Amino acid sequence: MQLFHTILAGFLRRNPTFSGLCGVLLVAITLIGSPARGADEPAPAAGLAVAPSAADAPKDVAPAEAPRPPGGAAVEMPQSPPMTPVPIGYIREVLDHPRPSSRMDIEPDDAGIAGAKMALDENNAGGQFTGDLYSLDAKTVASPNAAVEALQKFYDSGHHFIIVDASTDTLLKLSDWAKGKDILLFNIRATDVSLRQENCRANVMHVVPDRYMLADALAQYLVIEKWTNWLLVHGTTPGDLAYVEAIRRAAGRFGANIVDQREYKDVSGGRRDDVGVIPPGKQASADEAFAAEPEYQVIIVADEDQLFGPYMPYRGGSEPRPVAGTTGLVATTWSPGHEKWGATQANNHFQKDYKRLMLPIDYQGYVAARTVGEAVTRNQGADFAMVAAFVHGDELQLAPFKGIKQQYRPWDRQLRQPLLIATDKVPVSMSPQRGFPHASHADIDMDTLGIDEPESKCKM
């Protein structure tokens, strides 16, 4: 009886989910194995196992010894095996962005980190059965050099898997320092295409989509809806201009037409008073001065810092047109309004735990941490070489609430993933769209988003 109690208690420590059932079993078995009670003795309270008192023990009987095998040695009681620690690092760089036009676009302090923590809950739910214990350690830094120092400290303390929420330059510095070491970085912020092309790195996995993927996903939807004539309005930051290049590429790939392109120049201090009006196009000749504005069906906005874009749906010109791009209808990894494939439960869980809505950067942190958890579980261990090989290979199958298994492309380490086409309230579609089959593999339509293997300049 004592041996059974010990085994059952050990199982209960490792599997608290079954605590209710185990408690009932312990009570029942204790009652069955106890001496019969007198009529005047009170029964034990429901749900409590009552140990027999000293008075209940037979007189002049020696205490029971642990069972012994035929050889005479005492049987060792089973013990729970030690848990294997799987620490995950998180480096968050404070980026110097201009204040957006709306305070609602300011990210909370735990953006990204909260998503990774939610993934750790899932990792540890499975880890209690596999013997793995996951933890997340986050460091906030203010410069690339400080980020490298944080990475070094993580590595010295046994962290091999690092989630990076930082700029392109910082990510490259981290990758260079980590070269030749047992470190795998997960990029959840930087969308620069160069990180997947000439500046690709074997030790960097890209969870966040690049600008080509975002532009392609949006373009496919607009073309399917037959909104093929676009007016392109953009800011002047390097990010805005890079998004312009991605939009022009997507238009050429999927059959859209950019009828005009106009630049918005932000005047410091003036955008609170008069902002969002489409700037005039290039200077027209005398013969063109009275020509009508070009016909366009959609205004595409390239304004990654949200300086003027949010005004465009309502102050975009004399003719009302839908707005898409970096504001209005956007391509994104996540929406708080997403409700399919378990997304409702994910959003509810996140909102309950963190008292706010789940943002795309949170989702990206979640996927990064779940990648580690899935790889460790499937490999039945946290050996770095085995886990890294699994993440790089084609056996990884992530299922993060989009109805299709996801993995990383072998040629540039970019996560293959569907992208939501969403407003600030609800998703309206998901790309890739039907009607854009892959050139060589009809069943791999996700590779119609972003850089396909024949286009890749990545050499790792």
Please describe what each predicted stretch is.
Residues G10, F18-L21, K457:
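The N-terminal extracellular segments of secreted preproproteins, especially immediately downstream
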Residues M1-P16:
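N-terminal secretory signal peptides that target proteins for export/translocation
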Residues L8, T30-G33:
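Residues marking helix boundaries in flexible regions
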Residues Q2-F4, L26, G38-M460:
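Extracytosolic ligand-binding ectodomains
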Residues G20-L31:
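Bacterial N-terminal signal peptides
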